[in-house]
Structures are given as structure tokens and as C-alpha cells.
A protein has these predicted regions:
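Mixed-charge, low-complexity intrinsically disordered regions
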Residues: 1-147
């Protein structure tokens, strides 16, 4: 599943328009994260990597978890205990318009907890962002390609 600007993602009764897609190049791998918006609701969607995948990670930016960087080795958040999955300095490219995420370097820390729950902490030159999300089956989303 490749997401592009202006695609529409239907999820949980809302239609989100993809404003842009960030591609993180980290540890020899590329990982995409699409910013999708429905009025004031914002999702960050990590599409499946390959045809054999059947899960998509859906993130939301959170304000109730304040962490320094680098973050600790274990994070307790919303009754989950998160452990590191990967981290490093990523080179980020932007396709579309994402005002507060410029192309360039960003430090990234990804954590995982039981129940396919995830945290992603990003340290940009101008701010630190925390995303919390969960892995959902691909059939929970409907993707309508941009015209």
C-alpha cells in the first residue's frame, strides 16, 4: 500500500485526506508515514511495507506524555509498558505539504508494547513530537486514490 498526497483514507467513520508523506531513511531502511487530516482530526498512518503484510500502524500526536531525548529504556504510558524497537538519526524527505515537518535530519525512537501498541518520539531541530498508535488490520481502512 503506497499512500500519496490527496489520497483519502476512510477510518472509524471519518474521511481523512493525505496532506503529505514523510519518508524516513534509517539504518539502511525506508519507512513512510502519511499525515492525513479530517478537519481538526489528524492521523499519521504507516502503510504496509510488503504485499504479505496485513497490518497498518495508525498514530495520533499526543500531548500528555512529556519525555526528554534520548528517551528512557522503558516507557510507562496509558497502562502499557513500552520497550525500544529501533532508533537512530533519520534522513527525512517530504512529498506534499507538512508545515511542521521539514525535510532533513530527525532523531527517531520507536517503542512497542503488548497489544501491538506503539510510541514514536521524533526530535526535530525546532521541537520534539510524540506519536502514540496501534497496529490495525488493513481492512479497517479504505484507501481512495487521489484523482
Amino acid at each position: 500500500m503506497k499512500l500519496r498526497p490527496r489520497d483519502v483514507i476512510s477510518y472509524e467513520g471519518h474521511d481523512y485526506v493525505v496532506e503529505g508523506v514523510l519518508t524516513y531513511k534509517l539504518n539502511g531502511k525506508s519507512q513512510a508515514l502519511a499525515r492525513a487530516v479530517d478537519d481538526e482530526k489528524v492521523l499519521w498512518v504507516e502503510p504496509m511495507v510488503g504485499d504479505s503484510d496485513d497490518r497498518v500502524v495508525v498514530f495520533r500526536e499526543v500531548q500528555d506524555l512529556t519525555l526528554g531525548t534520548p528517551p528512557p529504556t522503558t516507557i510507562a504510558y496509558r497502562s502499557g509498558s513500552y520497550v525500544p524497537r529501533f532508533s537512530g538519526n533519520a534522513q527525512v524527505t517530504v512529498d506534499g505539504l507538512i508545515a511542521d515537518r521539514p525535510a532533513g535530519a530527525c532523531d527517531v525512537w520507536r517503542y512497542r508494547a503488548a497489544g501491538d501498541l506503539y510510541l514514536q518520539i521524533e526530535r526535530w531541530p525546532h521541537k520534539t513530537v510524540t506519536l502514540a498508535g496501534e497496529s490495525v488490520h488493513k481492512d479497517m481502512l479504505e484507501i481512495l486514490p487521489a484523482p
